[in-house]
């Protein structure tokens, strides 16, 4: 997809994108071994965006970043998503980050969908015990553990299905 850009356009685009995520243009000449983990993560995301994809898949791409860098990158991705009509599949254990960038959320546990919302405005209504654990990041209480174990046993037996709670919100029962 880079064929449509001249070398000069690629260079200026690269520098512009680096600045947008808090890196200077001098990073264009550095080798990966000269970069920190967070710098590498940002550059990998920018590299994927250089090709102007229609869909971007980010799998735990913000893990290990400090909160300021994470916020800067989320702001950039949110802006790019709107400006370029980019679809982002954002895989993360940070439900807060997903909330910030998502139009809808699908929560999975052990490879199965346990809850999903089509509209981020329904975020506060997420209610599955596993989702609650993700949202609050707190130690699990005895009652929450019992609820979770109940769902886990049903899951193991294959006795689960997604039920529509209200339009745009489905939960495993």
Where are these regions (language model features)?
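Short catalytic/signature loops enriched in Gly
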Residues: 119-173
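H-loop/switch region of ABC-family ATPase nucleotide-binding domains
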Residues: 92-93
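A short, surface-exposed alpha-helical micro-motif characterized by mixed small hydrophobic
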Residues: 98-100
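Conserved ABC ATPase "signature" region
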Residues: 9-26
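Hydrophobic anchor residue at the start of the ABC signature
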Residues: 45, 73
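Conserved ABC ATPase signature
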Residues: 31-35, 39
